[in-house]
């Protein structure tokens, strides 16, 4: 692996993050609860991380603004269009995950 500059590393990380968001956007059928069950993070977690990192750098971005970035639209609109009710199985798996 070749050496990268700090700037190149930041650019690569940013591009990777954009690809992750694009991948999640193209796979809206993957529900947040499924992500939480399998990986212990979801789109909302990414939004919280985004807002936190922005605030640590003095950028005034709140949670709702961060969710707009991650979801590519207002969260309420995304939820209405793409979020399905959680099944009993999903809720049970989520409870097991919390323990």
Task: Identify the role of each PLM range.
Residues 2-99:
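Domain-level signature for proteins that mediate thiol-based redox and metal-cofactor handling
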